[in-house]
A protein has these predicted regions:
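Flexible coil/turn and secondary-structure edge motifs
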Residues: 1-146
């Protein structure tokens, strides 16, 4: 579920978040069945498909709304995320700058942001930024792709 978290404005809009005025991060809330995929595996995918070493930036997108952050739901997720950060910190040339914070209020993004890649595959950002990440995921996690 696409959305926003970690800011200090109630019911933020994409327009306000994207301008950096709410302190929210653009996030994805993942609902998962641990019998199918573990939280640890989700964390591995997280490290695979984005750059956790650049502060407040993902590709050409710059600002705190693009920060690398893991919002955890409970102490077990926090411990697993801490262990994952420690493990993956040896895999990158630069230090991991990903924040690890308790989940504040999650605000669901506008309808047009849900399933954005699926609904807009020809859009420039989707074809040049998202598509290569999806292909990298599919190549690494073939068994998870339906």
């Amino acid at each position: 579920i696409s959305g926003y978290a970690g800011g200090d404005v109630a019911n933020p809009s994409y327009e306000k978040v994207s301008m950096g005025g709410t302190n929210h991060a653009e996030v994805v809330q993942i609902l998962f069945d641990p019998k199918i995929i573990s939280y640890e595996e989700i964390l591995k995918i997280f490290w695979l498909i984005h750059d956790p070493t650049t502060l407040n930036r993902q590709g050409n997108d710059v600002g705190t709304q693009y920060r690398s952050v893991i919002f955890y739901h409970d102490e077990q997720q926090k411990r697993l995320a801490e262990a994952s950060i420690k493990l993956f910190s040896t895999k990158f040339a630069n230090p991991i700058v990903t924040q690890l914070l308790p989940l504040p209020i999650f605000y669901k993004a506008e309808v047009y942001h849900q399933n954005y890649f699926k609904n807009n595959p020809a859009q420039g950002y989707c074809s040049f930024v998202v598509a290569p990440k999806v292909e990298k995921f599919k190549g690494t996690y073939k068994e998870l792709v339906k």
